[in-house]
């Protein structure tokens, strides 16, 4: 859990720095930076999506995961949670829910979140999560300057999501082979790609609704 705790702390520190710098950065500059990050997110998504080999498993996982997530309204649930936090922290502004949802997806859905958490739970090595912490802390500064304090609240999402994967890793060790992790990385990277498209304003995909696909690909890998 140490790696995940450090990761959450880095996001909070990055958010604090972003809030301090926010007033001095023109809106057009933060908008340009956000689009730049969006393009980088797209690149990361495309790169990671090439990890998988079982295309059929990915397609079925994405379709079934999207159906399950939509039925459960996961994206809406995240937005409602963001709005609830927004009401509790009125100073966060009307964009708090957007910052919370966007940052949570960026920090949780990526390959490093899954693989790093698994590595932490299976081997006790936190190196990948430490690297992710540095990257997340830097991006939190920029994201906060554009989206506000909601970005900092995503640290809770990271703590819960990555912490759960780390704790469950020991129990799932027999089935989480390198090949299975590669398929999970592939699906997660597809979601990162979709998020990047949202960030540059090309699409409005409800990415959170597809998160179950990351875990559905595990049984599908062995069945197909």
Model-found features: residue ranges?
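Membrane-water interface at transmembrane helix exits
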Residues: 18, 22, 47-51, 69, ...
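Glycine/small-residue-rich loop that forms an oxyanion/phosphate-binding "nest" at active or ligand-binding sites
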Residues: 57-98
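Long, highly hydrophobic alpha-helical transmembrane signal-anchor segments
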Residues: 27-61
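Hydrophobic alpha-helical segments of integral membrane proteins
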Residues: 21, 25, 29-36, 77-92, ...
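Helix-loop-helix junctions within the multi-pass membrane cores of secondary transporters/permeases
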Residues: 95-171
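Interfacial loop-to-transmembrane junctions
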Residues: 196-215
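Interfacial loop-to-helix junctions that mark the boundaries of transmembrane helices
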Residues: 1-6, 30, 49-58, 122-128, ...
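Alpha-helical transmembrane segments in multi-pass membrane proteins
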Residues: 6, 10-14, 18, 22, ...
